[in-house]
Amino acid sequence: MDRRLVSALILIVAAIISISLYITLMPRQTQAARVVVYAYNDRVTGIDPSIEDDTGLVVLGLVYEPLLYYNPVKNEFKPALAVNWSSNEDGTEWVFHLRRGVKFHDGTPFNATAVKISVERARDIYRETGRGLGYIWDAVEEVQVVDEYTVRFKLSYPQRLDIIAAASYAAYIFSPSALVKSGASSPMDRALEEWFNTGNEAGTGPYMITYYRPDSEIRLRKFNEWWGWSIVNNPDAPDEVVIRIVTEPQSQYNGLIAGEIDVASSVPRDNIADLVKKGFKVFNLTTFHNYIMFFNVKRYPTNITEFRKAILHMINLDEAVALAMKGYAVKGSGVVPHGFPGHVDGLSYRYDKEEALKYLNESGVRTPVSIEILYQVDYEELKIFAEYLQSRLREIGVNLILKPQPWSQLKDTAKGVWENPESTPHIIIADWWPTIPSPYDYLYSMFHSDSKEWNFAGFEDPEFDELIDSAFEVEGSNYTHALLLYKDAQEKLFNEAIAVNLWDEIKPFIYSGRIEIPEEAMNPLYMYVISFQYVKVKT
């Protein structure tokens, strides 16, 4: 062979080898992580999966999973950690068959023991301390581990345990390894609660906590071994979710405009049309999130029924809702919101100044008189409503003193109605969203004499307690009768003017064009939770 040809071939081979080595050894360009920033409007109050009963849901709903999910609007169940379930004829025994191959975030396997420990802990903490929302498991007498992937529940009275197993609180399953990591001697040991609430977690959900500052920011990272990725089939899901605490609505608006926020939960409603013009999108979620105005029934003069009715007849609720909510709410009726099981129409007071003056005269309260109203400081709609009510009551000689407070302080102040009612404001406005799709959730949590965490009226009435307890106990066997009992309970609250539902919120979530939020990412039972595993991030 010609030497020149050989030399040329050698050079070509050398060049190919060099190029191959360069391609092999050169730094690989990695795809930028998909990061979504979600602006949430309240500090996170806790992330203990058994006990948390407030704003921590926004985190719990992504990090943990229940046995089932339920959408009350569609009346539809979706399997989560359980794949199928059944009950005996009278609803006193339920069997759940669990999903196989599921891992907790620390790599330990999910099994029936985890379900037993999680359910019993939520139930027993509530039974012993009244904390959390573990009352939902009240009927559960025994949780039996049949085998690694089968759990049997034995109940003391019939219940729709499928609905309870899909609750937004007190139904999340955590890994038993958390007991070892926290140094807890038992599931009831406070050391476990402290471990959770310092930013640790033990869930199976699609995202894991990597950074936890409940007053400012929580960061979540995609859990690549989540069992559901093959079902969701969304390669464009966020790799990281940043939940940023932004309490001021105007700051959420500014963050969207600056490109610092991708999803905002609470921009000023007056600015929504402007944001749409700028290319932002809106997901309007019809919710079961309502705003309750409680009267402190343990303090003069709101301990007088006629005085409470005088105040209520000075509210033109249609006018007030339009003013405060800018079209993003439905006027309340009864305590249970529209579209929710047990809602009752016609339980709202009409504006009638003559009627108000009549009741004021019957109350024996001399005017001028001053009373206080407590509401959350960073909710613009409540400020607007409080100022509206202040103006109206001035017409009948009632001076309304405004007492806005941050949520954590407000809650502590409101609970004072039980220990120190004379120092607790006469009127308290607080919001509520459901734990389970039952009227009992609203009526028990906010008005039962045993529920002192959320009963801001200080209302105690054995007849009322008996009505709703009886209703809950027959829900699983005679649902029609249960609804009638719940209706009677709501009428009692209305007739005695203990509290009123001001409005049921339509929640606008504003988001940038770089993401897509499909319908399956939002479920009104799990308020403020965006299921980011369904969200698509454009790159």
Label the predicted regions:
Residues N71-P72, E76, S168-D236, E240, ...:
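Gly/Pro-rich hinge or "lid" segments in bacterial periplasmic/extracellular proteins
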Residues Y207, T302, V330-S363, V377-I384, ...:
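Structural transition elements
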Residues N41-L60, L81, T108, D162-F174, ...:
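A structural "hinge/loop" feature
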Residues V83-T129, V146, R152-K154, P301-N303:
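Aromatic- and charge-enriched surface segment that lines or borders ligand/interaction sites
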Residues H97, G134-A184, R213, R514:
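Surface-exposed binding/hinge segments that line
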Residues A39-E89, E120, A202:
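N-terminal lobe/hinge region of extracytoplasmic solute-binding protein
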Residues R213, E217-I218, K222, L312-V344, ...:
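Detector for C-terminal structural segments
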Residues W226-A273, N399:
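Ligand-site clamp/hinge motif
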